[in-house]
Amino acid sequence: PRYIVFGGLVFQPLDTNLFASAKFDDVTVRRLYTDYMPKGLFQKYRDVVILTRIESDPITSQLGDFTGFAVDKINGVEVTDLKHAYDLLHPEKTPEFHVIELFGANRPVVIPATKAAEAEARIAKAYGITKMENLTD
């Protein structure tokens, strides 16, 4: 499956398999899934990107309630697909913080950019992750 692991956050595109295997409590995610084709959301979003997991790490210790939400914006830019999300999380000029806005969340997820790479190294080692992203089917 396609995915991104960034600073302990795991992002995946919403598809039928993910929708069937995960219990999404967020009404917005369910609505995005059911409206994707009938209401033409595919014209705006090639993928609906979901924050599916938050791996345990000091950088993510306060972020437990954000799993299962759809990503709206990263660093102020509306996300159109998984590759776009990856590009926004890995810009040429790194910001001080990565701000990830989720549809329906009370506040954004904020990750200190300098700590994201350190967290990824710890998480890769702890969970045996050899590749932090897979952007192709």
Language-model segments: what does each one mean?
Residues 1-137:
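C-terminal recognition in membrane/secretory proteostasis and scaffolding
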